[in-house]
Amino acid sequence: MTSSGNPTCRVGLIVRLTLSILLVAATIVPPLGAQGDSAHALPRGANGPPPASPLISPRALEDVAPDPHTVEVYLTASPNRLSLVRGSTTDVYAYNGQVPGPTLQLREGDRVIVHFRNNLPVPTTVHWHGLHIPASSDGSPFHPVAPGARHDYVFTILRGAAGTYWYHPHPHHQTGYQVAKGLYGAIVIRAADDPLPASLPEKLLILSDNRFLPDGSIDLPDQTTLQGGIDFENGREGNVLFVNGQVMPTVTMRSGEVQRWRVVNASAARVYRLALTGHTFLHVGSDGGLFEHPVELTELTLANGERAELLVRATGAPGTRATLQTLAYDRYIPQTRPKDWNQPRDLLAVQYTHDAPEPPATLPNVLRHVPALDTTRASATRVMALSQGMINGRMMDVSRVDVSARLGATEIWQIENLVGMDHPFHLHGFQFQVLERNGVPERVRRWKDTVNVPKHETVRLIVRYDRYPGKWMFHCHILTHEDHGMMGILEIR
């Protein structure tokens, strides 16, 4: 535990005292998630179904490099005022004037130069979530960019990195606030030898949520209020759900058509349990790219920070519709469980056109080889015990190194969730493979950088610290939790 003079510790103490009072009150009032309508008020004009609008992908960052093997872009974070919901405008922070930010389109082997400018009134960073790049370009809290300052992020995309990633700020104590204000965007990395047909239409789905006051402003309550205490405990969830910054957009498909969907969970805390009415998914990729073999699913659970690649085959009759929903998922402590946690929420509509059916697409059964990390080469097994707001009983201290290891080492991490709510665990800088959950071997070998650890469960993973030394973060990816100290520092030498 850090000293009592640490601001994080003082805030955490206030929040815990507040929650102690709330938990006592829960014995005589409904659960804390069952607050009145004012806590979940929608802006004027936001009620009722939105007019049908086609799904729009965020525009791509413009590459200004003359060299075909270099991607050079300009990215600026600035205050802005945008319309996020019907009938209102909202003060936001935006990358290049849009929410979500523009998509960074890359290829394996690219040298990447991002000229970043911070026009915000506060320090910020840009964290390239999931990318295996030098620590100096990771955008961690160690490298803040001051208001008005510029910083160049320079890195190379390695072979085998093709997949779907995202970027967001990572300043100490301020990540959740800045993401809630609108700072997040997607990264798509392509491989020259992608095994999936290039003819497949591709959709990018960035899932997010937010909460608004009646005047359209973003609801960010003080931590010592009732709603602020709930946000601290649960992580901040919104009552408006977005796909690419849109409410309930529409995707059109021909009967029989197969589309490739790249899905990013950019929410601060919400877990999406995705299902498309009348359909199954072919799950073909995760955080670190494609699997060896497709896996057919009726639903997919995606924790915040995780990504997925899905193949969706249109099976509906011409003129009909299907709905992509997030189904009930109980990740909460019972006393702070929202009253509507068990209600499905609509995300996106699929409209089947009257065009002639699409001829069946031929899809490969083998996508790529995913080599297993060798458990016999693990030089250590480390236990990471997740409690409320702490890892191994300690809160984050930027002056302390929690784990030291040598460059090139392979280790096993045992992530133990000691409390009654889920914690998604994220490791910066290195992809890992999940070995087992509660002693049950993982069915699909895949590269991950974020893994959900459900309440009172244990996940074992294996990681190899290759190529890049330096200091790296590991933390719960519920943003209010990481902001209040549920993080640690890994140093690779």
Annotate the PLM regions.
Residues 125, 172-176, 182, 317-351, ...:
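Terminal connector regions
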Residues 35-303, 307-311, 346-388, 459, ...:
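Histidine-centered copper-binding motifs that mark active-site loops
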Residues 156-162, 313-319, 464-471:
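Short, surface-exposed loop/turn segments at beta-strand-coil junctions that are enriched for proline
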Residues 17-28:
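Bacterial N-terminal signal peptides
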Residues 113, 164-166, 260, 321-323, ...:
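Short, conserved beta-strand segments of beta-strand-rich sandwich/propeller modules, principally
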Residues 1-13:
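N-terminal secretory signal peptides that target proteins for export/translocation
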Residues 85-86, 128-130, 136-141, 145-147, ...:
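Active-site pocket scaffolds in enzymes
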